Amino acid sequence: MTFRHCVAVDLGASSGRVMLARYDSKHRTLTLREIHRFVNCLQKTDGFDTWDIDSLEKDIRLGLKKVCNEGILIDSIGIDTWGVDYVLLDKQGQRVGLPVSYRDNRTTGIMSQALVQIGKSEIYRRSGIQFLPFNTIYQLRALTKQQPELTAQVAHALLMPDYFSYRLTGEMNWEYTNATTTQLVNINTDDWDDTLLAWTGAKKGWFGRPSHPGNVIGDWICPQGNRIPVVAVASHDTASAVIASPLANKHSAYLSSGTWSLMGFESKMPYTTDEALAANITNEGGAEGRYRVLKNIMGLWLLQRVLKERRITDLPALIAQTEALPACRFLINPNDDRFINPDDMRAEIQAACRETDQPVPVSDAELARCIFDSLALLYADILHELANLRGEKFTQLHIVGGGCQNALLNQLCADACGIRVMAGPVEASTLGNIGIQLMTLDELNNVDDFRQVVSANYDLTTYIPNPDSEIARHVAQFQPKRQTKELCA
């Protein structure tokens, strides 16, 4: 067969897309077309910040039907989403309540309990995963302690992409790359850790053994009656994005830039040393047995919130105004947990500057400048930290995802990090999703083979560091501006 048609369902924390890929195996050309785009946003339910997954499922099915109605024979479907959040099911496979978002405050103080009762080094030794207050381990503990009446009804817990695959196929699956984000998978066995799971109060029977990317979960029956395989792709969106990052060699790092920024490198072995623990490095699962050694950064969430609060719709115009402002006048620590979900992001940023005796950003452009400069400096700090961890410097940084379209931030990143930046592809998560599908269909050999296809089909933009820029001169003296209770503990 010369042509393959694969559908990627890519759900982010603010929007979702159903994308159609067309792959010409003879010429190794790959094209993407957006079929359906929809909004994903939080809603308040019984005092909790929850996801409207019934609406999301409706949009997923609508997008799939649009493809089928075009007369296209779909070869496979894959679903990727953000990590850590889950859906509860009863014995009949029906949903128990709505899934609570990781941004809900129900986990406040829970991680501190775990550090005392289990021990930080013991949790890290078992999981190899960074300490974030909203990890699934702490969400489940909050659930079992705060809502025991709900817990009694639960028979299964599915992570978000696994839930939507279940709704399409009727088959349950627990995909490995996303499962590792829970901080509940044992890094040595690739299975759920009994000790960590027991601490949450959840039952091990809620979960099946994690499966690695590439297996067929089941079939979705389209309106025309065709049975279409649903593939377990690397269902954590960052895992998919890394698959599509055209990393040149072992000296290349990646930055998946979107609502979250995730900076790291690929490794065939995990890093779980005391140094890695002190730096709060995570070892999330990747495809083909590789590890995504990385750190989480709050990312463009801060900007997204400012845009929403200020009702700004012309982002290019705002960036142009921002570029004209001097650098490094307003600096914050983007990873301060005060920015996870404040009532007013603009006011929170201003308060952080005021508390550190800095000028206070007032205009929208000043707020954006504060966010961009602060992110670039944090990128530089973390890249240096990652290089020290592995004992070898990086020579190139690949920025992928929606954030790679921000030329100003890309250049600031290159200047602050002091290395060449390659930006693109934008649709990295979708492409990585498609890549695993094509491997499952025996159209491609492995991840490296797929990266060659990506490099041949998608243009990258190069940013050369300017050592004389304001932000480059500032790097050496950058420190978070006050003692913060950080997101990355």
Curated annotation (Swiss-Prot):
| Residue positions of the active site | 237
Biological process, per Gene Ontology: glycerol metabolic process; rhamnose catabolic process
Residue stretches spanning the membrane: none
- Molecular function (GO) terms listed? ATP binding; glycerol kinase activity; rhamnulokinase activity
User: What pathway is this protein a component of?
Assistant: Carbohydrate degradation; L-rhamnose degradation; glycerone phosphate from L-rhamnose: step 2/3
Q: What does this protein do?
A: Involved in the catabolism of L-rhamnose (6-deoxy-L-mannose). Catalyzes the transfer of the gamma-phosphate group from ATP to the 1-hydroxyl group of L-rhamnulose to yield L-rhamnulose 1-phosphate.
Q: Give the protein's recorded name.
A: Rhamnulokinase
From the broadest rank down, the organism's phylogenetic lineage runs:
Bacteria, Pseudomonadati, Pseudomonadota, Gammaproteobacteria, Enterobacterales
Q: Which gene encodes it?
A: rhaB
